[in-house]
């Protein structure tokens, strides 16, 4: 987790998909750490693979294939999500997650 946090601006704004956290954003390293720790509590074998990147000027769209299994239920999920990332001074300052990849492309004017 420390390697990820090193790539994020200390004041990062991270907006998980709307159904997570009641649609609210999280801010800063401490909240990101808490959010990711809560995912680890609920999900095992969690991993993401980059499928494709799109240059959108000040932003980058990342298509990800995500894999996880519920710790209590054993249910496996494989959502194909997108992140829209904004960078400043080499650090990610904003991350917005989309469950619909077309929505991510529309958000940056690529569709």
Regions found by a protein language model. Name each.
Residues 1-111:
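C-terminal and inter-domain tail/linker signature
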């Amino acid at each position: 987790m420390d390697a990820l946090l090193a790539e994020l601006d200390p004041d990062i704004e991270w907006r998980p998909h709307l159904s997570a956290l009641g649609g609210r954003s999280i801010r800063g390293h401490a909240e990101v750490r808490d959010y990711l720790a809560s995912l680890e509590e609920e999900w095992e074998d969690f991993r993401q693979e980059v499928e494709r990147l799109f240059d959108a000027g000040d932003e980058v769209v990342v298509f990800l294939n995500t894999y996880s299994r519920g710790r209590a239920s054993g249910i496996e999920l494989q959502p194909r999500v997108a992140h829209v990332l904004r960078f400043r001074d080499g650090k990610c300052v904003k991350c917005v997650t989309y469950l619909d990849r077309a929505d991510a492309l529309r958000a940056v004017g690529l569709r």
